Amino acid sequence: MKVETFSIGFGKPIVSWKWGEVKWQICFFLVGGYVKIAGMEREGDTKPQDIPQGFYSKTPWARIQVALAGPMVNLFFALIAFTTIWLLGGREKPFSHFTRLIGAMDPQSELYVNGVRPGDEITSYNKERFEGYKDLVYAAIINGRPTNIEGNKINYFKETKVPYDYLLTPYDSPLIKQGLKTIGILTPASYLIYGKQSGNQKGSIFRHSPISSSGIEPGDRLIWMDGELVFSVEQLTQILNSGKALLTIQRDKKTFLAKVPRLPIDDLQLTEEESTEIGDWQYEVGLQTKKTEIDFIPYMISTNLIVEKGVFFVDKDARMTHVASIPPTSQLDIPLQTGDRIIAVEGLPVSSARDFLKALQTKQTQMIVKRQGKINPILWEQEDIAFENETNWADLLPLTASIGLSNPLRQNGDFYLLNPVIPTRLKDFPFPQDMKDEMEGRVKKEMARVNKIANISVREAQIEEIKRYRNQLMLGAEFQDRPVIYNPNPFVLYGDVFREITRNLTALISGYFSPKYLGGPLFMVQVMKESWGIGIKEALFWIGAISLNLGVLNLLPIPVLDGGHICLSLIEKIRKKPLERKVINWLTIPFVILLIFAFIYLTYQDLARLLERFF
């Protein structure tokens, strides 16, 4: 066959030259390539079979061999790229990419109700070995049907594991983009290592952040906050915005921490006498806010901080609820009992009801960090074992037990209790003015979109969501994950990427996965640019992954693709006579149009994603 053009890459040629009768060119998208053979495109009224040395002038078997050559080069090139990565020692990736530990959960999910919490372990889903959070996303997307999930509930202090096994139905995720589903697990676990860019460096947006006065140092790992072990930034945000106060309680001769709802006083069902008494406390401590803006807890207490009774209150769904019926969302959600004595509010000792009322008006966060040397990368296969075993969790207990006492313990082993932090609402955070203007512009744009929604209930719900977003509390810290070395043998990596391709295709064909989440040509350019910025091994991975994608897609039985040419050649071999040119055109033209539309659609989605970053 006569080769007319040999192209390295796709798109517009960057450079081209003639060598003999063949045009050689290097194109803009340096992934894969193609060979243009005489006769593959129509030349006047000449039959394709009559073009000398043309593609259709050869036997079906010869054409199949030629059609296979391109995809096979792509597939082989991917293997070469993955082998090179393996020989270079693998890629450095975040701990969260491969961990089997849970980072954050939806408190309304069935899995959460069954007692699974952040920090617990997943071992399998649908009876298949669990390799990482991506497996759960695919399981929910592709199946959309009940998912079997197995794992272990971990008690880090007692070093025990209790197995669990549940069958759960995926539902729309409250955290991920609309159209994607979850079974209640929102993010994988990660390390929360306070980075240098979060410190008091000149020009840092975090320079005057709330956490800057806590005594935290670069390299510190946040372990515990307000009564809970912290396994992800998302969980940290949930704890920070839970609307609960951390109280130190004395019951009989024992002292313990408990989390109690902090509510607007107007939401509490109080008698006139009880309301008047709280008003007197407000006057005595000189709180200038309106009484309706005061926060309190759903308990009545005496002047010397003895719990007298629980009270009813209006919950977020406008239902009258008693404090005793609140479902627990934390191990510290312990209902207070008559006779309990409150001795501290969020670490601040109090001795009277008026002191308690004053302290309750200001949210303070208690945090414990693990102070250690540089954390070196480890192999991904050992990361969860290291997460569990490299920390002496029991050393936390003396620190947590002293919170709220007159002389709290500040250090025990590698653990340090930080100074209390008063978090700031997002809308009040001291961002640079240009960032503030950008954020306000986004909010106004989103409000304009929401105000056009015809459905009143949907519109009001989204307006409330925007308000919650602007009022969410934040520490003003940027945390880094622990790096791990991911270096499976090249055939395993090849198989992983191939399996991901087939899962995506299956989800697209079945309708469970929207094509708007796919990447187009601009996405590939963006990925390649970012990967080269990370390093040559990351760039090699994406070159190999894209090449493997192109090889697999090219083998699909679609006319105009190599897989389509193979199918047409097989049909000709079975029929023992060539197909008419008009039949080939009839089969090919619709798919050419479809591919053009797909290219335009994916490019549009790429542009939309890019513009989201700026507007």
Language-model-detected regions and their locations in the chain:
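Structural signature of transmembrane alpha-helix termini at the membrane-water interface
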Residues: 79, 83-91, 505, 509, ...
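Short, flexible surface segments
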Residues: 20, 31, 118-121, 218, ...
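Internal alpha-helical transmembrane segments
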Residues: 25, 33-104, 155, 159, ...
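Alpha-helical transmembrane signal-anchor/signal-peptide segments
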Residues: 1-4, 89-110, 613-615
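Small-residue-rich helix-interface/hinge motifs
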Residues: 1-50, 548, 553-575
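Interdomain regulatory linker/hinge segments that flank or connect interaction modules
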Residues: 44-84, 125-178, 225-294, 501
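Functional transmembrane alpha-helices
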Residues: 53-61, 178-221, 246-250, 254-255, ...
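Short extracytoplasmic
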Residues: 102-137, 215
